[in-house]
């Protein structure tokens, strides 16, 4: 239920993704939904890892090429922000985002859903790229951007 230690590296985890599944400390998962605005949500964080893991390491033939392209666009748009954080620049994103680019992506997803207005205001290009990538804008009343892409019929 609480954080756990993996035998291969003796590190403490709240969640992780592997080819065998998504593993999450239930206590930390539940905490993520007690405060929707603190920017911390292990469930969202690990789902972001699962998305990138599956797109880049999973079965390539089952993925929408457009989605992979949009994920690459995120890498281009997010690169300068990530590099600035690595150099120690203060940022809205949790400092854990500077660990590596995979963590940067996962922290961006947490922030996108937990404090979308702040991310939109501080990093409008990054925010717009994530909106397009995930086909939603949490700041809008009608959150889905392209209903056809989401499979919604009129």
Region locations from a protein language model:
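Short alpha-helix carrying the canonical HExxH Zn2+-binding catalytic motif
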Residues: 35-52
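Metalloprotease/metallohydrolase-associated module, dominated by Zn2+-dependent proteases
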Residues: 2-37, 54-154
